[in-house]
Amino acid sequence: MFALSANAADGTVGTVSVQKGNNVSVNGEAPVSLTLDGKDPQSCQFLSKRAPDENHEFTWKEVTTTRGGELAEILGDQLRSVDSLVVKGYVNDKDFHAMWDASLYGYLSVINLKNAVLENNAVPDTAFFHENEQYEGSSHEIFYYIGLRKIILPEGLEKIGEGAFYQASALRQVNFPSTLRYIGDFAFNATKLEMNQLVIPEGVEEINQYAFAFCRKLKAQVTLPSTIKKLASGLFMDAPSLLSICQRDLSLLGR
């Protein structure tokens, strides 16, 4: 789904560099071919699906669920009018879909899951990205972005799934609970994370490919845990504002 490949003329594969005008190189060598989801890169127009409402007033809502899958039912007609949402209780895939819907078609920009219990202790794959509803056109000429700016994740979370926040282009703030163990491919790819310190907690064992790629607003000192067993390629690709990347108890890794 998120396959990114680059091949030089001699068949070698290496570090990918994408410059203005889609000039692409592998380890500084050209020519190469670059594909995303099997398609050539295209310029994309970013639009909102939220219906304009001049009379909208900021709305904060706290919800307590007794079972997974009832968030949309509890919110009812308020689903697309809530700006800031606190969810206590049980949260499953269906509830994440409701929150995605509220941030795509509505006003939801802040989500607090601090006291929520997540199914499988995970943020599901593509929780806040649904290609068929966010892209339009045969070549993906139009992209409809979600308005999510901040999310607070709960202790007990172990996994952030593949593409969980992929192209959540308004997302600026997220926390990483001490219980986290796994960050999937493209998890925060192309977000606008703005942190001075990005500390991945001790206990995390895998951070997969392109998890923080294209985070161009991320002007941070990144600290990786000593527990890392897998650090995949392209992790911080095209994140030019990073100050440094260090691993606890080890040496400076560089950008």
PLM region spans:
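Consensus positions within tandem repeat domains that build extended binding/scaffold surfaces
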Residues: 127, 161-164, 184-187, 208-211, ...
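Short, T/G/N/S-enriched strand-turn elements that build extracellular solenoid repeat scaffolds
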Residues: 70-78, 94-103, 122-127, 163, ...
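Structural signature of tandem-repeat unit edges
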Residues: 12, 58-66, 83-91, 106-121, ...
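Secondary-structure capping and domain/repeat boundary segments
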Residues: 4-56, 199
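N-terminal segments that cap or nucleate solenoid repeat domains
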Residues: 16, 24, 36, 55-99
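Serine residues within intrinsically disordered or low-complexity segments
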Residues: 17, 25, 33, 233, ...
